[in-house]
Amino acid sequence: MDIASVVGLIGALALIVMAMGDPGPFVDTASILIVFGGSIMATLYRSTLPEFLGFAGVMGKAFGGYPDKPDDLIVQLAELATIARKDGMIALEGQEIKNKFLAKGIAMLVDGTDGKLIRTSLERENDQMKSRHAAGAGFFEAWAEIAPAMGMIGTLVGLVLMLGNMSDPKAIGPAMAVALLTTLYGALLANVILIPCAMKLKTKSSMEALNNELVIEGVMFINDGGNPRIMGDMLGSFLDGKQRERAMAALG
């Protein structure tokens, strides 16, 4: 689980509720229907049904764990390269590999698949992964664009109701509540939930894409029978300073 996402969301909502004091006046059924119901339906309208039905699972990824650490992947790739160079590709078959993308690449090596086909297959899968993740983040970005607009629509609805009932003082308060609370709900939904979710999905997608690129280059290096130490230096160039230092230290 991504502790930062959970703590950040709960903390933001808790601070907002604390600032409200009594949350009762900030709850309005009409405003909820306009902003939450309206934005969901509008997002469904601009999305495909499979994308819409899968949004809960995609959102869950924002709160799920992070991809493997790239420096750990480099160390594992170097270990696999050492085994392959010493005992041959077939010796890789019994190795425990938790990363599914790496496991696929190693399985293709063990099967004797042509190097060009291995690279093409892995690169295509990486591209498809990035496309899926981009679509998931795009869904929440689209929803984040719509939510404040629905808040503005609710504000206009509330103002029309208020102006149409100026002769009835009792109707002015509820109408004004709709006008103000829809704007609040739209801003909260977009800026506290949806935009951070989209950004977190993009961050994790970039991290996973980097890992996959490391795997592709590492698997191809193993296929070519390269020196594991040289492979560690080469793959380390993909990382930032601290990650590279950790990888080099682990490699010895």
Question: Where do the PLM segments sit?
Answer:
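Large intracellular
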Residues: 14-137, 208-252
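Helix-termination/interfacial motifs at the ends of transmembrane alpha-helices
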Residues: 7-23, 127-204
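N-terminal membrane topogenic signal
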Residues: 1-6
